[in-house]
Amino acid sequence: MQINLLNDFIKAYENTYSVSFDDSFKGRIQELCKELNEPFMHASYALENELKELVFSLDKNVNIAIIGQFSSGKSSLLNLILGRDCLPTGVVPVTFKPTFLRYAKEYFLRVEFEDGSDIITNIEKLAFYTDQRNEVKQAKSLHIFAPIPLLEKITLVDTPGLNANENDTLTTLDELKNIHGAIWLSLIDNAGKKSEEDAIKANLELLGENSICVLNQKDKLSAEELDNVLNYAKSVFLKYFNELIAISCKEAKDEQSYEKSNFQSLLDFLTQLDTTVLKEKFVKRKILNLCEILEDENQLFVGIFDRLLNQFQSYEKHLLLAYENFLKEIEILNHQILEQLKSISERISSEIFASVKEKDAYFYKESKGFLKKDLYTRYDYKAPYISSDDAFLAMFYNSDVMSKEFKKIKNELYKSFEEIKMKLKDFINILEREILLFKAEFSNIQKDHIFQSDKNFSELRAFCNASDEYFLKDFKELLFKSILELDLFFEKLNLKAFTNYENATKLSLAFFSRKINESRVLYELDSSEFVLFYPKKSEIYERVLNELNVYEFETLLINKPILTKIAKNFLEQSQNLIQEKNKFLDLKKAELQKRRAQILNVRESIKED
């Protein structure tokens, strides 16, 4: 069952994506369109339709647009081509929707409405649907069908005047995107004027490679004036068009002045157009334009990922530059902590040493000799002693000087640890600020062209929205772990040393008090063999060092410094995380590189064709 499902999936995939085409121009275009529509390209629905339309366009008529300023005579020109007055003429803007002139055996009109409906009606109804003064159902486009041989291979597109109104202008520009060539119609009075040239430049990319500039109303000029105007107009306009001619629609209406009108030159130009070449150039131009749009998208994504890579590069550089000083500060702190522990030990040992006193003591010993049997001799001596309770009370309760000093040292140490933690946080805050700025800038990014990939942009938005999850979470976990290790070490230091000084003092006092008492017992047993124990200051100091665990902390601070280890581990782990993030971003860029290679392959193939 599962094998059958898998085989069905593979077969469906091959039917969709493993299609082969012949070696004709159309077949090669189909192959290139398929490459742009590969699954990993994530083509938008609009792009898929555009690619299909490009292939279909090779079997359709070429579209030649009639473009010109309002009242330049476009309707009159098209009426001459149609052989009858179909399009209304006059001073009122009437051609408010694009109008297509197509071939049919009879004259009729098809009106396509904005709601998707359409009607077919008599050609005489055209004026009703084109007059802006009429309140009619919103039309999307008008299609005039006429039995004109020229229209068998060519569809003429009448566009609204460029300066009729803002909406007409926008519509005109939109319609120009789907034409193979254009007739730029201009009044001969405007020939060579800057305003006219500016309008041409604004639409230059949309004119195609087979366009003609037609100057209307040549009947207004004398032969000499016409030559001068043509020479000047050609010097200005011919760089934009294949050909430039002057006609007179007025003269072309009259059979007797038709030849003089030069209208036939325009018809000859249209008739002699190589429609196959036009279609091929059009498709090539459109595919190159699509490649440019997709490449722009690709470069945008590369730039976004490069920004993250640069941020991590800058962050790592900052870490390395700052960490040398940071480690030096920690090394200094290690020695400071050790010196503070020794200072506390020195202070306690001095107080204990000062509390060692002497007192009068005596003991009895059985007298020797026959006559002294059962008699005892008293021996007086000076005995060392420590009143542990009195000494302890004197140090910590009768006076709070030492307690205040130790508390001050502890607070200073706490601040030092907090400063270390703050510096670690500052490192992460630098990265966090950059990542959050990145998220804010790109989390709602939208495509700026309909042919760009919806899926790619959707995934990019999701990626940017989750950038803190992708790029901050691990660093924050590392920070949390490092701070926890610092807190644990501080707590250990605090419990075993800085809050243990009273207990260490008690233990030290008890130790020396016991040793003194033991020495007295031995001394009283045999004063010739044993001596009284008077603790030296160095002995007391060593004992306090042990009770305060100073030697243990000396190992943890100097020989195998825990703080330095935590700091170095933070740096090493940060660098490892940066490498991981860079690899992750490189994988993202590898996907983009694969798409870019596909785009470049299509671009090079279309240029070679």
From Swiss-Prot:
Keywords linked to the UniProt accession: Cytoplasm, Hydrolase
G1 motif: annotated span: 68-75
Region of interest called Inserts into assembly domain of DLP1, required for tetramerization, as start-end residue ranges on this chain: 1-16
Recorded catalytic activity of this chain's protein: GTP + H2O = GDP + phosphate + H(+)
Description of the deletion phenotype: Double dlp1-dlp2 deletions have no obvious cell division defects, have no flagella (possibly due to loss of expression of flgP) and are non-motile.
Localization per Swiss-Prot or TrEMBL: Cytoplasm, Cytosol
Region of interest called G2 motif, as start-end residue ranges on this chain: 93-95
One GO CC annotation: cytosol
GO molecular function: hydrolase activity
Domain Dynamin-type G, chain residue ranges per copy: 63-310
Keyword Transcription set for record: no
Region (G3 motif): 158-161
Keyword set includes Disulfide bond: no
Biological role: The heterotetrameric DLP1(2)-DLP2(2) complex tethers liposomes and may mediate their fusion. Initial binding is probably mediated by DLP1, while DLP2 couples DLP1 subunits and increases the effective reach of the complex up to 45 nm. The role of the nucleotide is unknown. This subunit alone very weakly binds to liposomes; GTP, GDP, GMPPCP and GMPPNP do not change heterotetramer binding. Tetramerization is required for GTPase activity, suggesting the GTPase domains (dynamin-type G) from DLP1 and DLP2 must dimerize to reconstitute the GTPase active site.
Assembly behavior: Forms a 2:2 heterotetramer with DLP1. DLP2 forms a central back-to-back dimer flanked on each side by a DLP1 subunit. In the crystal structures the 2 DLP1 subunits are in very different conformations.
Family from the record: Belongs to the TRAFAC class dynamin-like GTPase superfamily. Dynamin/Fzo/YdjA family.
PANTHER family reported for this sequence: SARCALUMENIN, TRANSMEMBRANE GTPASE FZO
The name this protein goes by in its record: Dynamin-like protein 2
